[in-house]
Every structure is written in C-alpha cells, then in structure tokens.
Amino acid sequence: MTLLLVSLLLASLLQISSGNKANKHKPWIEAEYQGIVMENDNTVLLNPPLFALDKDAPLRYAGEICGFRLHGSGVPFKAVILDKATGEGLIRAKEPVDCEAQKEHTFTTQAYDCVDGPDGANTKKSHKATVHVRVNDVNEFAPVFVERLYRAAVTEGKLYDRILRVEAIDGDCSPQYSQICYYEILTPNTPFLIDNDGNIENTEKLQYSGEKLYKFTVTAYDCGKKRAADDAEVEIQVKPTCKPSWQGWNKRIEYAPGAGSLALFPGIRLETCDEPLWNIQATIELQTSHVAKGCDRDNYSERALRKLCGAATGEVDLLPMPGPNANWTAGLSVHYSQDSSLIYWFNGTQAVQVPLGGPAGLGSGPQDGLSDHFTLSFWMKHSVTPSKGKKEEETIVCNTIQNEDGYSHYSLTVHGCRIAFLYWPLLESARPVKFLWKLEQVCDDEWHHYALNLEFPTVTLYTDGISFDPALIHDNGLIHPPRREPALMIGACWSEEKNKEKEKGGENSTDTTSGDPLPIHHYFHGYLAGFSVRSGRLESREVIECLYACREGLDYRDFESLGKGMKVHVNPSQSLLTLEGDDVETFNHALQHVAYMNTLRFATPGVRPLRLTTAVKCFSEESCVSIPEVEGYVVVLQPDAPQILLSGTAHFARPAVDFEGPEGVPLFPDLQITCSISHQVEAKADESWQGTVTDTRMSDEIVHNLDGCEISLVGDDLDPERESLLLDMASLQQRGLELTNRSAYLTIAGVETITVYEEILRQARYQLRHGAALYARKFRLSCSEMNGRYSSNEFIVEVNVLHSMNRVAHPSHVLSSQQFLHRGHQPPPEMAGHSLASSHRNSMVPSAATLIIVVCVGFLVLMVILGLVRIHSLHRRVSGTGGPSGASADPKDPDLFWDDSALTIIVNPMESYQNQQTGVAGVAGGQQEEEDSSDSEAADSPSSDERRIIESPPHRY
C-alpha cells in the first residue's frame, strides 16, 4: 500500500516538471504599431497587423495566445483576440471617437499566453509595444465667418491692394477640412475682387461723385468644398480725396474780458487719412509781443502798481528821465512804449556812469545794505547781435561799492542766451562767485522783466515774475579784481587794469570823466527800461509776481483726464504750449482743452495771432503724412468801460469874507464819486415798450481805485497874488499821494480808493486875498483810473463871490430901488465911475408932491431897466455863453451885473441864494437852470447803454 502511494506521488511530480519545461518562451509582438480610426467609427486599422507569436507552439496552452492587455490612462480602446492559435488580435474603440476632441491617442499593449490564464503565476507576457492611433477627420462642419458684417472706407481715385479682409473658420480638425480653400463674391457686377485669403481689392478707381456706398455678399469654402452655412455682408464707403489736416477749428476766436479760461479748439480733430502714426507733437504759439511789453499786464503805471502790490518803497531809478538833476541819461536814445513808459536804446557803443550821491540816491560813502542785500529790477529787450555773435559778453550793470570793511563789486552780463551775475563780496579777501542762468527769454528779442534778489550767498532771478535758480555756480578766483573806487555804470563795464584797453587803442573803448579815466568794454546792445535798485530789503516773490507777471497766456488744466502717454509743456511766459502723444484720439482730446486766459478785468483789446504747428512720425516713412500749419487769432473784445461819475453841488455863492478866511471855501463839499459798468440787454417783448432795458451793476473792487484827479480852471489861470487853491499836504503824504499845484491846474496822483479821493477832494478849498476884486470862477474836476485809460465826466463848479458895498446917499428917484440893494454890498472899483452921486446934500425936506413925482419917475425908470435886463437875458440865452469870463453862465440867474450904459444897476444876488441852496443839483440829480442843464449834458458820462471807453485828453498826472 505504501509503495502504491509513493509511486502515484512521483508520477504527479514528473507531470508537473514536464509541463513547466514545455512553457519556456514568452509571446512576441512588434515593438510599435501605427493605427488609424475613422471619426465616428470604432475599428482601428493597425500597421503592421496585430499578431503575437510564441515559440512554445504547438503545445497546448503554452504555445497559445490568450489575449492582449492595453496600458495607459483613460485609453478609449480595447484589444480583442481573434485566433489563439495564430495570435491574431484587433483593437477597437470602446465608443465612436471624435477628432475635434482628440486627434491622436498613444498607449502600450502586451500579449500573454494561455498557461494558467492571464493572471496565472506561470503565464508568460510579451514586451510592451507602443501603439499610435490617429483619428481620421470627417468633413462634418461648414465654414463660419468671424463677422456677419464687414465695413471699410476708401478714398476716391485710388487702387488699393487690400481694402479689407474677411475671415471664415471651420470646426473640423484636419487640415483638409478645417482650412478655407477659397472665397467668392456672390453679388454680380461689383468692382471688387476677393482672393483665397479673403482680401478684397477694387478693380477700378472709385469716384465719390458716383456710388458712395457699395454693398455685396461673400461666401467661403473649405478644402472639402463645403460652403459656409451663412454668408457675410460687406459695405465699402467711398470718401472724397483725403488731405491730412486739422479739422473742426475756427480761425477767429473771440474772447470777452473777464471770461476766465476759453478753449481755443473745442471741436478740433486730426485727419490722418488712415495713415498709422506712432508719435504726434504739436506746438501752439500765442503772439503777444505787440501788446505793451511782451504781453498784457496790469494797466496801472509802475508807481501805482507798486502801491497796489504792496511793494516796499525806497527804490532808486538809475535811468530816469533826462533833466537838470539826471543829466547822465541825456546822451541815450529815448523811446516810449505803448504804455507811455520811458525806454532807452543802447547801441553797443554807449554807456552811462551814474553819479554817486545827490539825485541818484546812492551815496558815495559806505553802502552796507547795497553790498549784500539788494534787488535789481529792470525791463530788457535783447537779441544776439549778428556782428558779435555769442562770443562777447555784454554788460548790463557794473558796480563797485564801498562799505565799512572795504570794497565789494558786482556785475550783471548777458552772453548769447545766458545771463550771468558776478559777485565779489570783498575785493581784498573774498573770491568772486559767478551765477549763470540759461534762458531763452534773454535772446528772443522780446520784452521781459528781470528782478535779481541778492541775499548772499543766495541769488534768485525772476523773469516775468517766475523765479529761476542758477544753472551753474562758478568760483572765479583767478579774475583780476577791479580798481578799488566806487563807480556805477550801466551799459558797459570798466576793465580790470587801468588804461589796459586804452593802450591797446581798441575801437570799442571809451573813457569816462568821473575821476581818472576808466577803459570801458563789453558794451550792451539792446533796450533797457525801468532800471531801479533797492537796498536793504528784498522784494518778495509774491510782490514780484504781482508786479510783472503776464496776465494772459495759454493755459491747460485738464490733467485729470489726460490720456496715457500724453505730455504737456508750457513755457514760463505761457506763450508756447507743446503737446506730445502717440494716440490720435487721446491727442485730439488733449488739444481740445488748450485754452487762452486773461486775468485782467479790463484786458487790452486787440488781436493775438495764434499758430499751431504739428510734426508726426509714421510707421511707414515712405507714406508718412505732413500736417499743414494752422493759423488763427484771438480777438480780445473791448471791455465794458467803467463809468466814473462825479456829482455834487454845481453852483454856489458865498460872501467874500468866507473866501478871505484862512481856510477858504470848500469847492466840492458834497462830492460823490461812483463807478459802474453798464450792460445792455434786449428789451422785453412788450409792444408798448420802445426802448431798451439796461442792467447796471457796480464794478469789482479793483475798478474802485482811482489813480489821479485834476482840478483845472475854466477861463483865466489863477492869479497867485489874489487867489489860490488849497489842499491838506499832510493828508496826501500820509496816503502816498503826490500833489502838483500850478496856476492853471491842481493834480493829485497816486492809486487810492474812491472813498479816499472823495475825502481829499472835499477838502479842496478856494481862497482869496483880502480885497481881491473877483466875483465869479468856474472850476473843472475830472478823475481817471488805470493809468488814465478810463476817465470820468468833467464836473464843473461855478463859484460866485458876494461883495459888500458901503452905504452912500442915493437920489430920491432911486429910493424905490433899494429893495434890490444888499446893505452890506460895496460896488466894485471898476464900477465906481458909474455910480450916481447924490445931488441933494442939503438938509431941505422935499414936499409931498415932489416926493410922489420922484417915486413915480423912479418906478417908471425901474420898469424900463427891468425890461432891458430881460431882453438882455433872452439875447444871451440865444447867442450862447459869449460873455466875459467873470460873468455868470446862467442868463436867468440874478447873480449878475451888467454894464451897458452910463447907468449902473446892482442886482441883489442874495435874493435867490436860498432858492439855489435848496434847488441846485449836481450831475447826478437835482434841477438846474435851463441853460445849465444844456451845458451839463456835455459833461455827463455817456448813457448807460453805450459800451465804449471814454476818450479824454492826456492827463497831467
């Protein structure tokens, strides 16, 4: 039994051992397979075909292929064994594949034999082969246009290689079916062609006079000849011939004073004719050199403006008007600017040496304040002289000053477009320092104001009220020091060594006669005006800006909406503005906000030329456009003229004793000065109204400043021995006003408010010497503002002097006329010869009949005389005011005397004096006599509906 079990066990072991020895080899397959599967199909065609071989064949199980295993993430395929004996297999898609989703698939496959099944411990597996499966496309999608409607514009008369391009796309994945092979224009008889890329061109020159808009339809085909499902529409507009230029601007731009900032080009746009640009630069230039000194500034005089701006006093005029006390300017050529200021011309061979001490106000002794703390102020118009070029310096001022420690020296020169200030704090020890500025204003041949503040070691230069720090500071220690002698020269400078230039005999050398001769060189060539120096205290920046800054110019404030890449630059004088950018639309927006601004309420009217120049850079230099220059002008309109109205009592009489008093009689005791601006508006739509409605409002504060008033005489000048005009000098000096008192006029000059001028003019008095035989005077008062630009009406005041006459005996036939005689009147000397002496100096008492006869005769004579007086009055009213200067201008006024015969008639002027005191009126209101009202009409201001500047004769102040 035991032997039987052992034999069975050995038999099974031998069988197993023989089976293991039979499955010796692994299956074999190709290393790589290429497969193709059609879209929407599942069978993969492999190259080479899928076969697995096993060298253990024909053994059962060991030589058979049981299957293929696929390896990869998300492989949408599966492997199928077709024949185990031959090892043939097949790869199929689990579901139809989509080429548009994935065109290619890559994975690995592995074959295994049939021993113990695919996962058996004794199963043999082949190596892993790579399988590439490409999904073949099917033309299932039609072309689709990117846009349904295409628009373009062309210029007439041109043939274009490409007007626009239409584009269609296809959703298929393969190049064969996804590419658009050609386009086609479906609309017949159109002058356009389309190529296979969708580019449309015109076949003939299009004319704007013909068809202005072309419409046609295009379609597309893919390479599988599948037509687009929806066709596209094309519209091409024909435009007239394009000229690159600025469009939408006005040549004439009107500016109303007081309007603030006014846009110059609110609707401007740049037409580039479709030429692409990558850089645009425009320059706007405002020409104001013809307005006063370079631009519109405050219209007040220099003296008045200094007071308004709060400038400190104490400046010394170094180039005053030639006169007995200022003869050093007599040899210079004198000109006058539009604002009547004095201008000196230096021709390059002239200079003036200002005497120290005396009228110049610069002492010859120590001048500590002037040595290191002072302000130089002057106007200059200078250009580069062609003969000199930029090589030679030109000296504006040169000064050596004596102080307690020794001598200091400074000079101000121009060199081309550079201005330099050389300062030598102490000639004995300190080294000179030179401050340099490079400014285009120095050499542009335009008027500019310069103010130099020295507070050593700080030096600040102001040009037209704008401060500039020095560009360079040099330590010029090698310069030879000038001679230690006080001297001040304008227009040139002396050389460092005595007689150095004189010995050379240079043509540009002149000797002065102040002390020892000084050789002169570096002459100035240009214009200077308003040259002054003030020592000890510097002018502040605010004061200098108020005094000399331009009140008009170009302006740009819309920085918040300034586009990206835009640059804006305005020069200091605001006469030049530059814009730079790279986008046309952004550039247009920026240029539309460039404005003109004039801060003066009463701007100088006239034309300001305007120029816009443009430079562009294109992507294509060959076809780059050129933008023509734009020229226009700003018209500053006439401002609404302020109407200065003087009013008060125009006629009064006083006893002579009042005029002979120590204070005289006030001429304008109730004077009123008003200033207003009248604006004329249209009348309301009312049939019963025939006139216009005028809206008058008070002017702003600056208008209420007067800069001068004049009291003149109508008729003969004042006789200083018998009469005079008086004013309180202390009150004038306290307010900084100047008084000029002549026999023909009295003037008050200086900027002050209307209230101050009213107060001062009410103190103006007329005084007579005791016993002066004067009976009537007429005075004319007028005022002005803004350097005499606007004048008031002429307010005329008539004054009658009432004289008393000593009581004398009268003949009986004139007793009844005693009611016309004032008890205190005294006949004037010139009428004494016509007085009637009494023929009855005895003590006889006449009878009653005689008295009655005398009274009747006297009454008859009185009636005749009154009739003659009335006839004479009517005659004077018709013939005008042709009477003597001493007579009253009022024919109806009883304050008169008339000598027309041997009789002397004295009319009591006090009879109507009370009526005149209550009934007299000034220019503003009240009732006047008929003849006075006709005279006053000429003196009144213009009617409120007239917008004009009042023309007046030149003033004496």
From Swiss-Prot:
The chain crosses the membrane at residues 849-869. Its main location: membrane. Glycans are attached at N299, N327, N347, N508, N741. It is found in: Postsynaptic cell membrane; Endoplasmic reticulum membrane; Golgi apparatus membrane; Cell projection, Dendrite. The keyword Lipid biosynthesis does not apply. InterPro entries: Cadherin-like_dom (IPR002126), Cadherin-like_sf (IPR015919), CLSTN_C (IPR045588), ConA-like_dom_sf (IPR013320). The keyword Heme does not apply. The cytoplasmic domain binds synaptic Ca(2+). Interacts (via cadherin domains) with both alpha and beta isoforms of neurexins (NRXN1, NRXN2 and NRXN3). Directly interacts with APBA2. Forms a tripartite complex with APBA2 and APP. Interacts with low affinity with KLC1. Interacts with SLC23A2/SVCT2. This is Calsyntenin-3. The lineage of its organism: Eukaryota, Metazoa, Chordata, Craniata, Vertebrata.
